[in-house]
Amino acid sequence: MLAPLFLCCLRNLFRKLISFQPPQLGRTNMHYSKLPRTAIETEFKQNVGPPPKDLTAEVYFPSIKSRSHLPAVFYNQYFKHPKCVGEYGPKNGAERQIEERKVLPTTMMFSMLADCVLKSTPIPILGVAM
């Protein structure tokens, strides 16, 4: 008799805990949405729009032209909009240092690992190895 009541209370408590989860983490919210169940809500947003007008070949292929670091993804203080460093143009030393302080440690680690892999991978289209 008490087991179903306990399970019901436990389920309600679990639902309350899930509803208090911070939305900055990009959680998927299917069950508490007013939209149909096929719709999935996430808190991540992408900056979609026309690219800046000063893009050049050197900007598109920074690792091929100058063997610079891979674009590192970092988030602003509230983790709302992901931004990419090094994708839209070269930075001077002061700007790069300020932005690298905001890079998450795991992101920096994966960026360095991917950079090592890219430098040892031949590119069949260009016929050169980085």
Curated annotation (Swiss-Prot):
Organism superkingdom: Eukaryota
Signal peptide range in chain numbering: 1-19
Main location: secreted
Gene Ontology CC entries for this record: extracellular region
Subcellular location: Secreted
Keywords: Secreted, Signal
The protein's name in its UniProt record: Uncharacterized protein encoded by LINC03122
Species whose genome carries this gene: Homo sapiens
Name of the gene this protein is made from: LINC03122
